[in-house]
Amino acid sequence: MSAFDHLGDMGPIDIWDGVRARTVDGEGCSFGVVELDPNSVVPEHRHPNEQLGMVVSGTVSFRVGDEVRELGPGGIWRIPPDVPHEVHTGPDGAVVFDVFSPPREDWAALERAEPLTPRWPS
């Protein structure tokens, strides 16, 4: 396996309705470029992975535990393991970067679609 890849050559995985990710797994973490359609919802959920992320484009309303923030490009979040969280996108949708530790085994088990042009970079 090569140490390098290109986003446009990676098939996305469908995470929820209107939410797809292109992921790379390392030994200690997973990295994802996640595309969220306009007005989409990532329902409340939790996982055993620590999660760090940043909005690249668009806007999201992000709830982590009891705290809610409206985030645009450059907005960053930190989610400890097993803390409930959810996301709602605005009318333009969003592209975000996510890093998980340990790696997301549940995402790694999902089937990848054929590669298609990513929304970012444009």
Predicted regions and their residues:
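Conserved short histidine dyad/triad with adjacent acidic residue
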Residues: 17, 32-46
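A short, N-terminal "cap"/entry segment at the start of jelly-roll beta-barrel domains
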Residues: 1-28, 32-33, 109-122
